[in-house]
Amino acid sequence: MQHGELVAVTTSIGLHRELTAASKQPTLQHEMKRRVFAAVFNIDKVISTFTGRPPMMSQACSSTSLPLDLSDEALLSGDLLAAAAELDSHGWNKYGRIYSTTILRSRTMFARIRHEILELVQASLDAPSEELVERAMCVFLAEPV
């Protein structure tokens, strides 16, 4: 599958949109949708960075939350609500464990910053704003590991 097709399928099945109610009560379906969307969003920014082309997915048109920092075992255990209750207020696990979703969440947070940088570069602005640099540092410093 080509990247354009991947983005088209992702948006046509609505992975870029999340109902407000979905973000309050985690379910296996919502978490899997978040994981898939985050992975595609990350790929989009990497491809844009290396090809010099504009990103195909707009951050402004997405309402999908980051996936929660849960292990695959916790996600599939059947007691997702209890596992989610063990997370901190930002959705990270409190025990410093590194799961595949930990890396995915982190990459997605940086992909959001990268998206804004790509917009600046594509608009031929000279340098990123101080506010953008400061937010990138905040994301970096807020990493749990």
Label for each model-derived stretch:
Residues 1-11, 36:
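Extended, hydrophobic alpha-helical segments in both membrane/secreted and soluble proteins
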Residues 1, 14-31, 43-145:
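C-terminal transactivation domains of fungal Zn(2)-Cys(6)
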